Structures are given as C-alpha cells and as structure tokens.
Amino acid sequence: MRVTMLVRCLAMMRGGGETRHLAWARELTALGVNVEVISGVPLLGAARYPVDEVPATLLRSPYARDFVYRFQNRRGFGRLTMTALHVDEELFCRAAWRHIAAASQPADVVHAHAIHQAARLRAGDTPVVINLPGPPNKRYVSDLRLADALIADGWAADHLPAVVGRPVERVPKGVDIERFRPDGPSQRDALGLRDRRVVITVARLVPLKNVGLLIDAVARLHERVANVHLLIVGDGPEADALQRRAVARGVADRVTFAGNVPHADTAAWFRSADVFALSSHFDNSPNAVLEAMAVGLPIVATDVGGVREFVADGSGGTLVPGDDPDALASALKGYLTDAATARAAGARNRDRATREYSWRRSAQQLIDVYHRVIAARGRAARASA
C-alpha cells in the first residue's frame, strides 16, 4: 500500500500534529506501508526543521502561518488572518496534488493533516482521509463532507460528527513509552535546578496555548513556594511577549525559556520537572500531556477540549478552570509541596500510558481505515462503470 501524507508545517514547526504524523509514518513503514510525506517551505525561505526520518518531499508555496499566529487574536485582524490561512492551505494543497498526479507510482490513499480542502482539490479518484485536531471553520464543512473518511481523537472525535453531519472514525494517538520513561538523562543539574521545585510546560508559543496564564500562576505561586521554577519548552511568535510578561510579573529569574528542543530530546526536559502544566485555551488531545504521563509526572491542566480524557478521574492530575491563575497556582502547589502525592500520581500516569497508548496500535487502526476507503472507492467505481 502506498500512502501520501500531507503535513503542511512539518518542515516549519513541530507541534502535536506534526509529531503525531511523524510517529504514524514511522510505524506505518514498520508495518510494511510505503509512506511519503509532503510538507511545505516558504517561497523564499528555508526549512526550519529537518525532515529526514521518513521519505519526504518539500514543496514551495506561500507560508502565512507566522503572520496568522502573531495577529489572529488582535482586534480587527480576525477575518484577515482566516483569509491568509485559507490561501496558505489552498495553495499548498494544489501544489501537493500536482506532485501526486505527476508521480510515477500513484498513491493508494492521501492522508491530510487538517487540510480541509484536500478532498475538494483532489486529482483523479484517489481516496482522501483527513484527520482533524479540533473544530473546523464553518466555511470548510462542505469540503470535509467530500472526504472518504474523517478521523479524530479526543474532543474532536466526540463533537465533529454533529458539526460535519457524517461519521468520524476515532483513532487514538500513542506515545513512545521507551523514549518517554521516568529513568534516564535529565537537564536539571545542567540548568542549576537541583534544589528547585520545577514546573514544566511543552508548547508552541502561540495564543491558543495561553502560556501567559502559567507565568501569572507562577508569579502567585512563588509567594507560597519559595524555590519554584518554570521551564517553558517551545518557541513561537509570542516568545518575546511572554519574556516581557515574566519580567513584568517579577519572575524573570524563575522562568527558563528553553526555545525549540528536538522531540527526541524532550524526555530529558520532562525528567527535569516535578509536575507538568498545560494552560491552553483549547487543546483537543495534547501529545505533551501524554508524554509527561509516560515520564511519570503529575498533570495540572485547564479543563478544555479533550484534556479531560487524560486526567478526569483525578488520580493522576488536577483540572482547573481556564483563565484562573489562582486555581492553577493552587493545584501546582499541591504537587510541589507533597512529594508522596506527586509520586503516586506520576506512577499512575506512567502505568496508564503504558497500558493504553501505543503508536503501533494506532497505526494498525489507520491501516484499517485505509483499507476500508480503498475498498469503498473501488466498489463505487465498479458501480458507475
């Protein structure tokens, strides 16, 4: 089977969606699937991340994501940023289909990551599978109905069928439990944090991730926990503003901005912490939470999107209301000042991640979806002949 994955930003940024598709591509290849990944680079720029783990083609097209993430929440820019995002995806998708159509060996399935137009713009009759990490803009609902299958997990798997008016296949994510394990190298000593109580977040620094809320919580927390320290792993257009916020809140010396860290190295950063925090406005089913669980950390997270799937029962973490820095600070304090409770929660998280989340199992479910859409399109072609 030949599968072509369209992952728009794989060469430009690494969030949960990009990480997931790399993991899928590796596992599918191990299961005997011939995988090609198509990603994009700017017309005049270069790739920011190497794409060398899987066979990949990088296509040049206008890249608007930096503009979108910087301005999407500013007053008066909403419509402009949505238009820019639409044009970005549309032009990349057209270029990808031209590449697919010209290939000497056609793809059996095209699997697009959150590229809503992928089925509408298809060349020929190749089946199209689209995975969705959250609620689509209303303008794309008719496009999504043209896909041969929609897949999702978390919040999206529960809510999208009503939005798009068709079934959505649930394909849960996985985690590399060998890489993300409690024992192994740590950055704590190198960062001079041996005697600190450390909170970590791993996120793109974009408005949706709301990392400013976590900085505000740490500003409140340091009055109650004298040696608290925050590690922020990730980069993005809000990095400078967040650094200024830490200065304004008087906690610049208690916050480390690590910038981008290769995904293969993030486990060592997780191991440097005592608790993981997520402060997003919305997160469908965040990879970073699952990776922190696998490392054996307790979780404190805003009760948004699909995060509840991981910590709803309270055994491995605590959910707090969104945009409430006092509640976030209080929940973090509970784990930072009670090592036994933190260890027990982390152990339960490690056990659950090991038992329930496997990239191999996730990839096998994908293959089942691919086989179904190939068979269904073949039946449709025979019926119309």
PLM segments and residue spans:
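Short alpha-helical donor nucleotide-sugar binding micro-motif in glycosyltransferases
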Residues: 260-261, 268-273
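Donor nucleotide-sugar binding/catalytic pocket of nucleotide-sugar-dependent glycosyltransferases
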Residues: 129-182
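Short hydrophobic beta-strand element within catalytic cores of glycosyltransferases
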Residues: 298-301, 311
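Nucleotide-activated donor-binding/catalytic signature segment of Leloir-type glycosyltransferases, i.e.
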Residues: 243-261
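A conserved mid-protein helix/loop that constitutes part of the nucleotide-sugar donor-binding site
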Residues: 19, 23, 197-225, 230, ...
